[in-house]
């Protein structure tokens, strides 16, 4: 499967380029960067430090998309919306690991999925997506009359959105387990005199610092006991492997908007 990496010069872009080389059935056929990037015109393999691959980095995505089978995208919300539209024009797979998308962004991506096969997830790791299933089951079994749910996440100092896409993914899983809407029952910030905790809400706490790739814990707390479900990312390659797995799974599927739960057969 011929894959294009967008944001090829970034941390995740370089990780994707390296990881593609080790996965059977996947081949790098294009690399995209923004206009004005210092990487334009350079070989994607040389930028990544793995030697010449014969793929030059460009800022003109549509001709590259037209010759590919899929796109791997961990960029920004605005860029991902644009790439979704181009993937729709090219009728190819678009795997989106970008976080921080607004409701309006998601609507535009959903519209593009009429013609592109899009897999979008707040986290591409296989472990996190299994964790989301466990969180949903735990939230359903341990009801709000007894157990409070708090979600704690920590990332490196350079992350620009909060709570993380993974924290929100886990929050949505907990909300499904409780049969409630996360948007109406989440507490994102606590400061000053807040009063007692409101029963049934799902709390979020965000930490930023150092080089932490991603730590997430879902805490279900009752009087006298706590259940903690956690995931710790130790290498960005887990996200790259998951994204490539998603692209290979989506190749040949009909256009639509899918998630990693679909890829893993966990969508019940």
UniProtKB/Swiss-Prot annotation:
Pfam families the UniProt entry points to = DapB_C (PF05173), DapB_N (PF01113)
Query: Which reactions does this protein catalyse?
Result: (S)-2,3,4,5-tetrahydrodipicolinate + NAD(+) + H2O = (2S,4S)-4-hydroxy-2,3,4,5-tetrahydrodipicolinate + NADH + H(+); (S)-2,3,4,5-tetrahydrodipicolinate + NADP(+) + H2O = (2S,4S)-4-hydroxy-2,3,4,5-tetrahydrodipicolinate + NADPH + H(+)
Q: List the disulfide bonds.
A: none
Instruction: Kindly list the GO molecular function terms attached to this UniProt entry.
Output: 4-hydroxy-tetrahydrodipicolinate reductase; NAD binding; NADP binding; oxidoreductase activity, acting on CH or CH2 groups, NAD or NADP as acceptor
Question: What's the main place this protein lives?
Answer: cytoplasm
Annotated NAD(+) binding sites: 7-12, 33, 97-99, 121-124
Q: Which domain of life is it from?
A: Bacteria
Concerning Gene3D superfamilies, the annotation shows:
Dihydrodipicolinate Reductase, domain 2 (3.30.360.10), NAD(P)-binding Rossmann-like Domain (3.40.50.720)
Query: Which terms in the GO cellular component ontology are assigned?
Result: cytosol
Sequence positions that bind (S)-2,3,4,5-tetrahydrodipicolinate:
156, 165-166
Enzyme class label: oxidoreductase
Q: Does the keyword Oxidoreductase apply?
A: yes
Where do the annotations place NADP(+) binding?
34
Protein's cellular compartments? Cytoplasm
Pathway, according to UniProt?
Amino-acid biosynthesis; L-lysine biosynthesis via DAP pathway; (S)-tetrahydrodipicolinate from L-aspartate: step 4/4
Q: Which UniProt keywords apply?
A: Amino-acid biosynthesis, Cytoplasm, Diaminopimelate biosynthesis, Lysine biosynthesis, NAD, NADP, Oxidoreductase
Catalytic positions are 155, 159
Q: What is its EC number?
A: 1.17.1.8
What is the similarity comment for this entry? Belongs to the DapB family.
**Can you name this protein?**
4-hydroxy-tetrahydrodipicolinate reductase
